[in-house]
Amino acid sequence: MPLVPIGTLIRPGRGLGAFNVVSLEHAEAVVAGAEAAGLPVVLQISHNCVRFHGGRLRPVARAAAAVAEGSTARVALHLDHVEDEALLHQAADAGFGSAMFDASGLPYARNVAATRAAAGWAHAHGLWLEAELGEVGGKAGGTAVGAAGGTAGGAAGGAAGGAAGGAAGGAAGGTAGGVAGGTAGGTPGAHSPQARTDPAQALDFVTATGVDALAVAVGSTHAMTTRTAELDQDLIVRLHAAVPVPLVLHGSSGVPDGELRRAVRHGIAKVNIGTALNLAFTGAVRQRLAADPAVTDPRRYLAPARDAMAAAVARLLGVLALGDRDLTEHDIA
């Protein structure tokens, strides 16, 4: 089936699952999971994925698109966490229908200016654009839109003058940062109420930038490996009432099923998931290699890993599709 515009897949009361892919096996697993669930899905290629592939967007985009087009599922192709305009400007020609431009590490006024310019370019080239406001935290790979000397720490930057460390460094002159949304001496981390998206500011941001969707900070964090995050459901309700575009939840791997379903019921339209799939994938690889340490053919461990990821995708899509259903005690557990 041809790629589908992401906007046509968003429906009130159902969370649209958006899954990050790193390899061909990831893309195959996500699409297989969507087919099994009978639900639409988003294949997401992040800026970090592009870095992993040597900075070359087109090969991984073409591979993901080919997998989607060979499927019976409705699939959108989305470029996630774009941190510079040069990569954004490759998106339309590479087959993407949408992108997420991430200038959230900049001070508010600069975030607005950079995002407004990105949205103008995207709309002129037929792209749907998502942006972020607030501190979700946990992103690896650097700060948004070259924020050296700004307020957010990079994953590989030097700590000169920085007040808060990241996983591998902080921003020169920066006051907050880190792959874990660290708080040492700086800005509160992603789980702190002070880091969350303000509804009034969110409305101003959307109005000023013209974006098509907004990723909001409501208590989740990227790269969590335990499902212990507690979302600010009241804030989601207020954001949904204030903002006229779909809301997006990033860092959803650490959010329990019941919390995800509540979030969808309260107004989250798109749910980004990556780490949970990597846990399923690498767990299956470890299990296969532990059972047969002498195996040398990568297909012997990649096939079960792909199957495990597909099962995780199908399950999570089912969770998100039930966002408008009355919750039970089982869901809340």
Task: Locate each region found by the language model.
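C-terminal alpha-helical cap/extension of soluble enzyme domains
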Residues: 256-333
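Cofactor-binding active-site loop characterized by glycine-rich and histidine/acidic residues
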Residues: 54
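Alpha/beta enzyme core
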Residues: 3-12, 24-49, 58-71, 82-150, ...
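Long, intrinsically disordered low-complexity tandem-repeat segments
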Residues: 144-187
